């Protein structure tokens, strides 16, 4: 999905440079610290949401599955993972929890889900559900805005805010999105 390109490192680099005025050369230490933090939190998020993403991807491979049985929100289900960038992002749900949320969905065997997890893991940023990826980026930007508003800034250097809504994220961040070569030539 197009939203996945907004979670790429290149997009966050551009946001840090433009919106937060953190220069990768003159502010190298801060820039690298913030990028490393972003990558770490994104990896935590990926690991915490991987099982759900794998389960949902497996549903698409069940011939008898009807989309009416599982309707997903644009946001990751809070009952499965209610996370904050300020603290470790860790999954606390199981397949049984997912099945309880979606009782009309077909049962997927654990080994099938594990195979799908391995398949998705080749590039989590591009392979996981784009709506959840952009939600994570949005939450990370809110985290940066909060950091910028404090006197003891750790990941920003000025009182700068990058404001937009989650619903308007694709439009607001379009100038920063990573665009792969094959899409440029399309």
Task: Walk through the language-model features, giving the residues of each.
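Acidic, divalent-metal-binding catalytic cores of TOPRIM
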Residues: 1-186
């Amino acid at each position: 999905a197009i939203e996945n390109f907004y979670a790429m490192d290149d997009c966050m680099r551009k946001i840090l440079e433009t919106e937060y005025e953190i220069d990768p050369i003159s502010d190298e230490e801060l820039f690298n610290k913030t990028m490393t933090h972003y990558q770490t939190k994104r990896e935590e998020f990926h690991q915490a949401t991987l099982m759900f993403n794998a389960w949902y991807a497996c549903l698409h491979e069940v011939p008898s599955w009807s989309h009416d049985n599982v309707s997903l929100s644009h946001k990751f289900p809070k009952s499965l993972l209610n996370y904050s960038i300020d603290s470790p992002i860790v999954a606390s749900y199981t397949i049984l929890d997912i099945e309880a949320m979606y009782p009309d969905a077909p049962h997927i065997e654990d080994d099938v889900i594990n195979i799908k997890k391995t398949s998705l893991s080749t590039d989590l940023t591009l392979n996981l559900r784009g709506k959840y990826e952009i939600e994570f980026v949005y939450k990370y930007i809110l985290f940066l805005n909060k950091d910028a508003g404090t006197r003891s800034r750790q990941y920003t250097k000025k009182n700068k805010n990058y404001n937009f809504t989650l619903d308007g994220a694709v439009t607001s961040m379009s100038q920063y999105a990573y665009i792969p070569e094959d899409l440029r030539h399309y």
